[in-house]
Curated annotation (Swiss-Prot):
Keywords: Carbohydrate metabolism, Lyase. This is N-acetylmuramic acid 6-phosphate etherase. Its EC number is 4.2.1.126. A lyase-type mechanism (elimination/hydration) is suggested for the cleavage of the lactyl ether bond of MurNAc 6-phosphate, with the formation of an alpha,beta-unsaturated aldehyde intermediate with (E)-stereochemistry, followed by the syn addition of water to give product. Pathway: Amino-sugar metabolism; N-acetylmuramate degradation. CDD domains: SIS_Etherase. It catalyses: N-acetyl-D-muramate 6-phosphate + H2O = N-acetyl-D-glucosamine 6-phosphate + (R)-lactate. Belongs to the GCKR-like family. MurNAc-6-P etherase subfamily.
């Protein structure tokens, strides 16, 4: 257990702006919370340089066969699992490429597992169970920056030569000193003292969104601002796939539906076939040669 006292943590300090939150009308209470929430985006903005460095590292890792692994406890762990779980349907990647590990295992997603966050060894065990390697990226998430479970993971990852990133909301935390890249949006005291699922959790979610989204953009999963590697696994996504191809190419719905059927709803290939006027096999050959980057594939045939 690290010996940082809670009274030194920004996230545990008392918020002077909300001391009377229990004595005001409902609307005023919500305004207090909303005023605090407005500070989150500004805090994240101040960390963009560090976030950019992290995105570059993650993107390179993906291109070299590495993975993005989130570790955290409680709210922080849940946010990692949430971000990871959205990557396969959104970007068509395997469920192994971006993974979230929460202290205490899957059951801790729904019910707190007291004490799980206090074990460094438990995180090391969890990382070994997924064959974590030096080619992977480890993102440790903890509002306080002092969670032993996460610190154990960061230390282990450093020890095997992997890139480590910390996402905390306290400056100069132990985690930030251990990680290769420190991302620490300082959102200030919570509206409810110590309730880091609020501003700190929101800031962490914003950062994780940027990390995964930025890396997917860097690795050709986006064309313009369209998610061209999504998996059309339900009716809504089938319709979205059609709209994406129409938006990307300007083609009529009838042509788009025909091409999508031909490619088994491979959105990226469908777009390139329409843009290049090539047959399926030739289009796929060129797209594969350019590692799935539509822009680069189009340049090759221009």
């Amino acid at each position: 257990m690290t010996n940082i006292s809670l009274d030194k943590l920004v996230t545990e300090s008392r918020n002077e702006n909300t001391k009377n939150i229990d004595r005001v009308e409902t609307l005023e209470m919500l305004k207090m919370i909303n005023d605090e929430d407005k500070k989150v985006a500004e805090a994240v903005e101040k960390e963009l340089i560090h976030i950019a460095k992290a995105v570059e590292k993650i993107g390179k890792a993906f291109l070299n066969g590495g993975r993005l692994i989130y570790v955290g406890a409680g709210t922080s762990g849940r946010l990692g699992v949430l971000d990871a779980s959205e990557c396969p349907p959104t970007y068509g990647v395997s469920y192994d490429l971006v993974r979230g590990i929460i202290a205490g295992g899957e059951s801790a997603m729904f019910k707190a597992r007291e004490g799980a966050e206090d074990s460094k060894k438990l995180c090391i065990k969890d990382l070994k169970n997924i064959d974590f390697s030096k080619n992977d990226i480890l993102v440790g998430i903890a509002a306080s920056g002092r969670t032993p479970y996460v610190i154990g993971g960061l230390e282990y990852a450093n020890g095997i030569g992997a890139t480590t990133i910390s996402v905390t909301c306290n400056p100069e935390s132990e985690m930030s000193k251990i990680a290769n890249i420190s991302i620490a949006p300082v959102v200030g005291p919570e509206a409810i003292t110590g309730s880091t699922r609020m501003k700190a959790g929101t800031a962490q979610k914003m950062v994780l969104n940027m990390l995964s989204t930025g890396a997917m953009v860097k690795t050709g999963k986006v064309y313009g601002n369209l998610m061209v590697d999504l998996k059309a696994t339900n009716e809504k996504l089938v319709e979205r796939a059609k709209r994406i191809v129409m938006q990307a190419t300007g083609a009529k719905r009838e042509q788009v539906e025909r091409i999508l059927e031909e490619t088994n709803f491979d959105v990226k290939l469908s777009i390139f076939m329409i843009e290049s006027s090539l047959e399926k096999m030739k289009a796929k050959e060129i797209l594969d040669k350019n590692k799935g980057y539509i822009v680069e594939a189009i340049k090759e045939i221009s």
